[in-house]
């Protein structure tokens, strides 16, 4: 019998295992996929020019202490997000304009800019206030909330773009309280949106985010991680837990940590069943339509025209793109996010239609026209990832509670049930939705287990 079974080898699960092992506990990690990392997935280019991050990619070593410490510990290399050059806003399919990166689009009137600034500053101020979310804010959608503050049409569109980019949902689909609390966990709205050293999109891993996952797995120990081991049943027998996999293996431990999205608890056979209120809140959580298309080129042709590769779009299918090149290894790419309603439509297309739609939009955004000789039409590799299609993810980034549920079920959401403990970036109060948040939650979940087992001695292996 082990001291602890961890279900899920994403960053929360790996960190939970590491923290528990450091306290002297015996740990086994069970992962349904044939790889570690969860929603972090770095795929090598066939050309040998680095990696494409199909999942989480951005970090900030100064604001995210755990990630920063691990990068130093393992000697991992990072790349700074490229900001130099002009950005582009695509208002409609055939309407685009250029503007200096980091400023409000220049075609807005003074009144429209002031209106956006008012709403932005209000959310920023609310997100910097300590304390729990307000029930009143949890019972209205983000769109209803900003309309109540006097948001104009362009501000409403921009905030909806934020919702799509940040969570893969429309602003009419989740609560204002959840949005504000998410900002609160992540140093405020401005830090989340920032691509410089003040924000969450400052750096990327040179060799892909999975390089950190691999390093963490080495600490856990490969023999302690069982891949391709989907869970069949989880049984809490009061004194210990028994977890059986669909491959016929059975594991026993005094405690079990679930490190999977709460949206997927209902798919597990847990006995006895989770309490009704826990089921009510977790059965209703949703993951956004959060997708990526990564278009790789032989060279960064967009820089020739003074662009930094960043664009945002109301028309889609791509709603935002960034230059994710690693010049050192001759990796030149545009990472395109296809989220929210646009992502739902795009995800229904077959792969070559998805990729064609993205390249067609890139041609319009960068003024390539119908010139088939333009480099935009000549990628060397194209990747796409629809996270809703991924069996053991069902979307990204972090599960979002239903309207009114965040405050109504705060007393049970993410809290231990018997010998079962729950971790994941969704539960973190630091950098929720980011790798740092996953590491934070894993630490806390393991600390719960260590405390609960305190004084009871180690299990006999």
Please provide the spans of the model-predicted regions.
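Core beta-strand elements of the Rossmann-like FAD/NAD(P) dinucleotide-binding domain
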Residues: 2, 246-255
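N-terminal Rossmann-like FAD-binding beta1-loop-alpha1 element of flavoenzymes
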Residues: 2-29
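Glycine-rich FAD pyrophosphate-binding loop
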Residues: 21-47
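Dinucleotide-binding Rossmann-like beta1-alpha1 core, especially the glycine-rich loop
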Residues: 48-122, 131-132
